[in-house]
Amino acid sequence: VKPLYSGRLDWVASLKDRPCPLNLNPVTANLDTSSLPAAVLWDMDGTLVDTEPYWMRAEHELVESFGGVWTHDDAMLLVGSGLLGSAAILQNRGVDLAADAIVDRLTTRVQEQLASAGIPWRPGALELLRELHAARVPMALVTMSEQRMAQQISGIVGFDAFSTIVSGDMVQQSKPHPESYLTAADVLGVDASQCVAIEDSLPGVAAAVASGAVVLAVPHMVPLEPSEHYVRLDTLAGVNLTTLTELYASRRRSSPSLTTTQTAKDATPA
């Protein structure tokens, strides 16, 4: 009886003289993988997804329910801030609830909007996320939102993008303190200085810079001035694995002293 595999022996033998590619991943086949960042750390609200309008609506409804007034300028003050700090501001505007209750109400309302209106992805974010995942670059979601909301958004991505999620209810210090970014890098088993962090707000950028990461700042609701401390991009649209790797390598060459030894004081925005 002729073995089923006998017809393949000549084909197998023909491979012995062919060079064997070390990189079997088609996404990174033409890329110097030694120049890839150790991980990419994503902010969520305003960077990955355009949820800031949902938060603003939730804040407005909550303040008005207690007879107060909440303006657009008021809402802009909270962009990128931790939820407990935001709750204190809402209390000062007349919301007669404990801080934890305010956070719970806001998060629930935003999640309701996500469920009814869908996930508004920021331009280019999902495409870059998908390409990084295909290239097997470790990724973390680093957000000041609660874990339940981060899990909701992560679950809708459509693939297992994030190795870990560090949320605001997991850390002691909110952005602009670097704790969340340092925690994410630690969980991934990498040094923050070998990571790329993608952010959109001043507190978030300050936190990422203070962690020692190479920072891509993509402003959304609040403008960010050019700075030697980060790479500013108008949008993630058109940014791919090659672009990100080149930006990372260029930044590492121009700032070889990037380190995770910066202090929390350095993270505080001017």
Where are the model-predicted features located?
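Conserved G/P- and acidic residue-centered "switch" motifs that form tight phosphate/ATP-binding loops
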Residues: 43, 47, 143, 200
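Asp-based, Mg2+/Mn2+-dependent phosphohydrolase catalytic module
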Residues: 1-38, 130-131, 137, 146-270
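Structural motif
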Residues: 78, 142-144, 198
